[in-house]
Amino acid sequence: MGRWIVAMAAACCGLLGVAGTASAASVPISGLVSKPIAQGGTCSTSPSATDAPAGAHRDYCVAFNLDTGSGAGQDDAKKITIGLPGGVVGDPGAAAKCTQADFEAGNCADTAQVGTVSSTVTVVVPIFLFIPTQMTVTGEVYNLQTSPGEPARLGISLDQGLAGALSPVHLQSPIRVRVADAGLDSVTDNLPKTALGGSLHVDSMALTLWGWNQGDSSRKLAKPFMTLPTRCDADAVSNITVTSYGGQSTSASTSFRPTACDKVPFTPSLEVGPTTTPADTPGEAWAKLIVPGTDTGTGANARRQAYLKDVDLKLPAGLALNAPLANGLVPCTPEQFGFGEDAPPRCPANTEMGRVEFVTPIFPGETLTGKVYFGEPRPGVPLVNYISVEDPRLRLKLGGYATIDPETTAITAHFTDQPQVPFTSFRFIYTDPGDGRATLTSPVGCGDYSVTADMRPWNGGAVQSPTNAFKVIDCVPPTFQPELGASLPDTQAGGPAALTVHIGRPDKNLRLESAKVSLPPGLTGRLPAVPACDVAAARANQCSDASLVGSAKVSVGTGPAPLSLPGKVYLTKGFDGAIAGLAVAVNTKVPALDLGTVVVMNKLMLRPDTGIDVQTEALPQKLEGIPTPYRSIDLTIDRAGFMQNATSCAANPLHGTFTAVGGTTANADAPYQATGCDKLAFTPKLKATIGSAGQVAANSHPPLTVTIEQPDHQAAQQRTVVSLPAGIGVDLKNLSSVCTDAQLNAGACPAGSKIGTVTAQTPLLPAALSGGVYLMQGAKLGALPGIALDLGIIRLKGSVALGQRLVTTFDGIPDVPLSKLVLNLTGGPKAALKTSKNLCTQTPTVLAEYASHSGKTAKETVNALVSGCGVSAKSAGLAIKGKLSGVKKKRPVLSLTVTSAQTLKGLRLKLPSTLKLGSSKTLKRAGRVYLGGKRYKKTTVKWSRGKISFTAAKGAKTKKLQITLPRGVLRMKKAIKVGSKQTFTVYGVTTSGKLVSAKVRLKAGK
């Protein structure tokens, strides 16, 4: 906006006092008048009535009295500053301009005259015998050519007084614009105070600045000169300050109230540009406010257009704030801008974001220019503008701000309480530096877009809302081609991994709304290694660093230089069916923007192949109304001990599924392949227990427990084949109820198809997985049913074949480390397994063959533990007493006394899980056996199939055996609390070879 130059006459007279005698005193002011009067009216300290129709052209009267002289306490005026009200302006183009040289020579043409002056002076000069003599002098006010940096200059010419007794006085008064309110100040300095060898004192002055010719032939104005304010709801205040030669200042003020504001016209218009712009592109944008420069009406009824007070420039939805604007942009502080200071702003260069062009009638044919600076944002107001018209003749400093509709992203720029200054054109331009940092980015869709300016005048009239439109062109066909990338600094199979996933969206593609990245099986995280953050805390950005697993970098915006924002990635607890989550907390704070920390939640979904799907929630498409078109998302998961590589070295890519705003989908892959599989160990171990009391004889249905354990950081199993002991088959009549694939996938297998339970432990999950074991429908009619392990989110299916042994094969096991898998098949009359011979008459063996994802294989033959051989302890009359001591010092001692109703020839002892054998040598050397109360030294003592076995020499037999295992024979596998009960299983071997079993619980002693 521009500031108007008021044509101001400084009634600066030839002045005061007797040189050398005046004291340092102030100069009192009285009778101040500053107001419009009717043409032909009297301008004095007692003027004609006020005639102040708003926006009209009226003569303007400034009059005042000064109390100067040579008396005690009086001083001469050195400087007079007259400040006219804001909105009282003069048009320097209304009259010709007289050169300063011609003015001093008294040669100004009447076409340069813009007013008259009258002054009453008192002279004390020799020609009047130093008798104070009062006289009235008159003169003219001229429009002068300016000096550099001045908007206007007035020349006040006082004619000769007393028939030539006084020489003409020529005073020049430069005009300056007040930065605070754009009002005009007339400043006259170094005023004369002597005349004709004596002193000259000004008693009063009256200055008339013409409004318009209005039929007065003595006036030669080319157009109206003075114009009144267009505001009627407040007084128009004038101020005068007189400074004496002694440095003392006196001020006075007066006011008038304009009238008839309802008669003031206001018919603005609007232009916007560029008139055409390519779609979805950052670039220059401008709006031009236009106010007619011609009057409405003629003569005394002529009115200037009302001054603009407020404007709300409403941009269409789609023309949005461009996030990359914040790249390198910093705010200018109010102190740096210098509101109210008549000096250029001190804002840094990287605060500039636009320019202004200002056309005012004061400078015909000229366009004043200035800059738009980025001001300090306020809460809820991310875009603040400081505007400076940077012309030394007319310096304007204005403030504006923008509000953004949080739903539509439409921007409204607000400029309020603008100074009362006339302009015909004010063009506000958001520039484009050419590097993608333009303030605005164009709409995505082609078509016409309207801009509206709600313009409110100072006269209190109706808001005018001119509109204009621009056209968006060059729309590309809807394209959605997102990119997916993955990088790892170390791809050692089974080793620690630091994974960076990159999602890219080319410019002008459809906006990305969500993404799902499917990691290949084996490339996964160890959830127990990191304490998970609560979901509510994560959404509130309150996760601690204990849950931190990586970092993020998100870039948003259109054009060649999107805005890059940093972030952190936290592991969270599971939600909405996910086993866990990732909270990506992006910090939006940069010097030019602070929308807080934005948290986007991601679900970690476990697939049936044990791979992880990372599924984002819907990405926010705008923040406080600022669009966030995602250009790239980089997530780096590098917490030590969290991620690990797959144990398969086959190429297995990451797969991305992306959804655009509007529903369009696209896919992309990123290559991944682990290396060094040959370096991985592969040593799975199997244990098996079969049978129970009453279910070991031929044609019985024994339960079966198979446990497979494997150390961590080894290759994962890909194929496992287990061959059960000879003599164990299936009972076909118990295989009638089976589960179909559809039922299994739905978790709805018939109850009759369940044959057991399964539990799996993996270092990847904080808790074990468990579920049922089911008979599956055979691959073809007449085939044996298959078997399925239903662990809920993981389901493994195996095949069953019957030859010399019953063989179960699990193929295609996912690449996931299993530290322990326990399979329990139920025994009993309806069980699937059936014996063809007594299990207690042999040593059953289980054959196991393994193949790993790394390519390594392993096999083993394991003796199965048979449970339930022999009669029960109660029916055999087996009684056991014993004592366990020494656990406090971790040197356990065990003594047992076994009494049987049947004759025994040996004993087997199964230890609890808390104890183990120290060594076989110590057992043989230190273990003591008593038969019938006497120590027996011919006993064979050995460790076999997880049991301590005591066998007497051939022919020896007894119904009572005592065993003592002193310190050193047994060792503790883990701590045993004093007073806890430990369970031992005792098997008595009868002379017929049958086993009599019983369990005893012994209280652990010190």
Name what the model sees in each region.
Residues 19-21:
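N-terminal signal peptide c-region/cleavage motif recognized by signal peptidases
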